[in-house]
Regions:
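ANL superfamily adenylate-forming
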Residues: 8-9, 40, 130-188, 203
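AMP-binding/adenylate-forming catalytic core of the ANL superfamily
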Residues: 105, 122-124, 284, 393, ...
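Gly/Ser/Thr-rich phosphate-binding loop
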Residues: 281-286, 295-358, 370
Length: 479
């Protein structure tokens, strides 16, 4: 059993996420601190105080005009945007449960997501409305969800048949309300957010996070790596808000520590790096393919990235050669951090810190996290021997939405079974070496083989289907 070397954060169990964010200000940032600016229109901004006020007023509108009740699911289907952030906070403030859906999802995939989530409201980007409508035509949900079209005034097409966000909400005369109150309840049992993950196998499942989970994640980040997660952090942000990594780092963290984030609708390599240079970003977030390209790309040598002190890579471990290449490019003091996690553990299993790096290791357990490494019979394995990674901690998810069987099978004696194979060295550093689970990782995205097989087998001329691995050295995929 391996415990975190960092202090265990004290996670409150009697506040909602909104109450926590309203009452805690670790870097004492002023209310007028600009925390969000749009990637495509930098004049569109949001301060800490504006985010809170809008959440309080929009929550009132959700309750009075849309009938949103505690625990109701609101799906957000759209790319990263300031409106996405504002929606999530309004839903939390009202006591609802927001559910992110990847904006690249097809109508076929949406039918599955909507069936699992059973939303009372679907907030959809105006450009994606036809796709959402197509999916809803194919479904027979218990109740028909109300549609809310998301689009800022500068780019939203007017949809006469549906209310719009934020336009119609901003014109509302609703008075702000107090945040969802959990002062006399156990926040470990109250859902706050949801995203989709394939888990260890099968089709994507709705991973439900409690208010306790999300608060614990924020505290874990801060305690484990305060050098990076603070008010002085600046970044252009492309990881999808529909995934837990994007939810916490891009949606919740700025509302807590007051760091500056520019949401990027869709990742584009050169525009991302150019904006990081212009913004004087302190952090780069990369997947292995982008990291490898940076090391080899002579076209970016003229960009000033001297403000970057940390590179965070997730999706798969970086090779030692890529880590060294990034340090040559950005400076020898740059922290290149391999992160590891899964949606069900809120991505805080193992973290490097500024002063604790070891090649392509994924680090040590984050604050408050305990890890076991076991063989196929769930016996502990010795140091240096591969085994499955099992996890305990306050960031471990609440449940799979409406799926008690899969929820139960994800645990063994209270430990979350990750399905990932790791080994630990004599210094307590973890190394990710493989996967037991049936899951393909492509550029940071999860793809379940069973989904690919189902699509292939739907063709009348296909009798059977399977997959095999293929290595791409230019994307740093393993042999």
């Amino acid at each position: 059993m391996y415990h975190s070397p960092y202090p265990t954060p004290l996670v409150p169990s009697d506040v909602s996420v909104s109450q926590f964010l309203l009452s805690s200000n670790p870097d004492d940032v002023p209310p007028d601190q600009k925390i969000l600016s749009d990637f495509d229109n930098q004049q569109q901004t949001l301060t800490l105080q504006e985010l809170r006020f809008n959440a309080a007023r929009d929550a009132s509108t959700f309750i009075s005009r849309f009938g949103l009740q505690e625990g109701d699911v609101v799906c957000i289907f759209g790319p990263n945007s300031i409106s996405w952030v504002a929606l999530a906070h309004a839903i939390l403030w009202a006591g609802g449960c927001f559910c992110g859906i990847n904006f690249m999802a097809t109508a076929y995939e949406l039918t599955h997501y909507f069936t699992v989530a059973q939303p009372s409201i679907i907030a959809v980007d105006d450009e994606l409305l036809p796709k959402a409508l197509e999916a809803l035509k194919q479904l027979k949900l218990r109740t028909t969800p109300r549609l809310l079209v998301v689009g800022d005034e500068s780019n939203a097409r007017k949809q006469e048949d549906y209310p719009r966000f934020p336009l119609d909400f901003r014109s509302s005369k609703e008075s702000p309300i107090q945040p969802f109150d959990l002062s006399r309840r156990d926040n470990r049992k109250i859902p706050a957010g949801m995203c989709f993950s394939s888990g260890t196998s099968g089709k994507p499942k709705g991973v439900v996070f409690s208010h306790h989970n999300l608060i614990a994640y924020l505290l874990t980040l801060r305690v484990t790596n305060p050098f990076t997660h603070n008010a002085y952090m600046r970044e252009a942000f492309f990881p999808s808000f529909a995934h837990i990594y994007g939810i916490v780092s891009g949606v919740l963290l700025p509302a807590w520590v007051g760091n500056h984030v520019q949401p990027m609708r869709k990742f584009e390599y050169l525009p991302y790096l150019r904006r990081c240079s212009e913004l004087k970003a302190t952090v780069l977030r990369l997947v292995p393919a982008a990291a490898v390209r940076m090391v080899k790309d002579t076209a970016i040598r003229d960009l000033d990235l001297s403000s970057v002190h940390t590179v965070m890579c997730s999706g798969a471990p970086l090779s030692d050669a890529t880590v060294k290449g990034l340090k040559r490019l950005l400076g020898p003091e740059t922290n290149v951090l391999n992160g590891y996690g899964m949606s069900e553990a809120t991505i805080t299993l193992l973290r490097h810190t500024r002063n604790g790096q070891k090649g392509s290791s994924v680090g040590k357990p984050a604050a408050g996290v305990t890890v076991c490494v076991v063989d196929d019979h769930f016996n502990d394995v010795p140091i240096g021997i591969e085994g499955e990674c099992l996890v305990k901690g306050p960031t471990v998810f609440m449940e799979y939405k409406n799926n008690q069987t899969e929820t139960a099978s994800a645990f063994r004696d209270g430990w979350l079974c990750t399905g990932d194979v790791v080994k630990v060295d004599e210094d307590g550093y973890f190394w990710l070496t493989g996967r037991k689970k049936e899951l393909i990782k492509y550029k940071g995205n999860q793809i379940a083989p069973v989904e690919l097989e189902a699509i292939l087998l739907s063709h009348p001329l296909v009798m059977d289907a399977g997959e095999r691995a293929r290595s791409y050295r230019e994307e740093d995929t393993p042999d």
